[in-house]
Amino acid sequence: MALSKKPTTGMKDILPEEMQIRDYVISVIKDTYGKFGFTSIETPCVENIANLSSKQGGDNEKLIFKILKRGEKLNVAAATTEEEVVDSGLRYDLTVPLVRYYSNNAASLPSPFKALQMGNVWRADRPQRGRYRQFMQCDIDILGEPSNLAEIELILATTTTLGK
């Protein structure tokens, strides 16, 4: 079988020129948010399917690229439900992984905790013109700060970053 030269529908190759621009923008974002006290974190791109799936269903359920179980855990022929063959999925945004990360590590983190995340996310929806199934997302959050001043700080940090 011949090699398909085009990426899968909804995916994109990034050429060196665009990668240089992307790297520069990422460095400006990290530098600016860092001056506001945001700390970079990284979470796995694969999350437990139970964390990604909401109990109410909804639109997010349709966004998940589901990953089949492997090895002894996978028995497709005997499976009667999706849960029997799927145990994880690719993250569709950075919020769910952040919640899991914070709940697992809160005792080791400062309070309030200012998180900066940048990473690829995947959405299993039908790509429309100019949209992709894989793209980079940037997210800042302040956890453990009950006042509305945190919201103002998020806005100030973002407008400062976008102004550069």
What are these regions (language model features)?
Residues M1-K164:
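TRNA-recognition modules of translation machinery and tRNA-sensing kinases, especially anticodon-binding
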